[in-house]
Every structure is written in C-alpha cells, then in structure tokens.
C-alpha cells in the first residue's frame, strides 16, 4: 500500500503557503495569530 504522505514542495506551497493564507480572511487570521505568538515560521 502506498503511504499517504508523498512530499511535494509545489503542492505544499500552493495549499499552505504565505500567499494562499493572505488570500482569505481566515488565512490572514492564522498569520496574525502566529505573528502574535512569535512563531519563527508564519507559513510553510
């Protein structure tokens, strides 16, 4: 059986990247929450 996680940098960026997060209100909320928490990496 094939494993469920088949890494791909392109797909990772397209679904969880910074630009994708900034597109929606909820995504911006995620970025802001991570900024407030002091995360080193905001998105992928």
Swiss-Prot record:
Annotated Gene Ontology cellular component terms: ribonucleoprotein complex; ribosome
Keyword Membrane: no
Organism in which the protein naturally occurs: Verminephrobacter eiseniae (strain EF01-2)
Listed InterPro entries: Ribosomal_bL34 (IPR000271), Ribosomal_bL34_CS (IPR020939)
Cytoplasm found in the keyword field: no
Pfam families: Ribosomal_L34 (PF00468)
GO aspect biological process, one term: translation
Listed name of the protein: Large ribosomal subunit protein bL34
Annotated NCBIfam families: rpmH_bact
Family as reported in the entry's similarity comment: Belongs to the bacterial ribosomal protein bL34 family.
Record's keyword terms, sorted: Ribonucleoprotein, Ribosomal protein
Gene3D superfamilies in the record: 1.10.287.3980
GO molecular function, one term: structural constituent of ribosome
Lineage: Bacteria, Pseudomonadati, Pseudomonadota, Betaproteobacteria, Burkholderiales
């Amino acid at each position: 059986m094939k494993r469920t996680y088949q890494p791909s940098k392109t797909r990772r960026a397209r679904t969880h990247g910074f630009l994708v997060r900034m597109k929606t209100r909820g995504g911006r909320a995620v970025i802001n929450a991570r900024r407030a928490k002091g995360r080193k990496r905001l998105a992928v």
